[in-house]
Amino acid sequence: MGELQFAGASQVERDSGVWIDGQYVGYLKELKDEKKVMLLPGEHEIGVRQAGYKDFTQTMLIEPGTVHTLAVSMSKDPRAVFPDGSAAELKLNVKPERAAVFVDDGYVGHAGHFGGVFNSMLLSPGKHRIKVALPGYRTFETEVSLLPGQKSEVKAELPKGSIEQAEPLIKKP
């Protein structure tokens, strides 16, 4: 086995989601200590994603008994569209907080980033599909219809499940 460590210079990188060989494993800053990434020797496809940024992908050759560090650098996506002044606010109260959050099938961050007293996401008014998923837990899905300026909250506690139940969004970046 070889260890893969991640280095991110800014909060953007540290809050980005990580996929290894097409499987979501968590967000960058948590992948250490008891959640450190140990991989079988060989080539592995690493993907890092964050809303509003271009996907970062790299193939890593993992050698047995070694520690590899991947420096992650996210760059803004000029095609990203952000809500205007009529945006609605959606707060997520989700357990576990490390679960991946998808809005309209696009990864937007981990659940802990959109909950608590000061955290939420801004969405354009209208209908949106919200999906919260984490390997080893059952996926939560709901649809929200938001009005301009509306404040809403979604609460969910993901029940334990099997890795076999992981949705395609969790399996493929």
Question: How would you label these PLM feature ranges?
Answer:
Residues M1-P173:
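Short loop/turn and low-complexity linker motifs enriched in small/turn-promoting residues
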